[in-house]
């Protein structure tokens, strides 16, 4: 069985009810559910939540919510791995054996069905443990600066002060959208970022952090602009 697991707890602090707040005409989580359905990759689209209202909204958009997430996995400090591990364990014990699982964030409206398909293909082709979305930094991280306690400026890597941008290695970061993995990887690995993982590259304009009200407004502008060109 191939499953998508969408983590969506109810206790978001900076943007209350973030996972079901309306984003460009739909509850935020609906965009992830619809992308998963349109990809054709999944036998089940599961939402892991501790919140009855989120569960109801998720079901209304076609997701499966067969259990409520335990309280101990629903606080501000629980990471992605134990949440997906819990869902995979539950499905293995109560439904069918999972072969591949994809963690798809509820707050990833920019994810496309094609992105999910590419991730699945890469996972299998490369015999990888994980395949997850990344995008590149807009500026060379080797030339990053910090502000000291006295308010002065210092480079993290002073040896690159005179380096040309085109001579520096390109750096990438987690795009925070989706993470494909084998059942074994989800159940046994301690980190997603290891030598057994492969990257699914996304363009920067489709990678938007949505953590504040300003982020939300900017993301809606970008989303509408992107959709108007399709």
Regions found by a protein language model. Name each.
Residues 53-100, 111-114, 118:
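Short phosphate-binding loop-to-helix
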Residues 79-82, 109-196, 201:
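Conserved core of the sugar-phosphate nucleotidyltransferase
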Residues 102-104:
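Short aromatic-hydrophobic micro-motifs that form the base-stacking/packing surface
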Residues 199-201, 206-230:
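Hydrophobic helical membrane-anchoring modules
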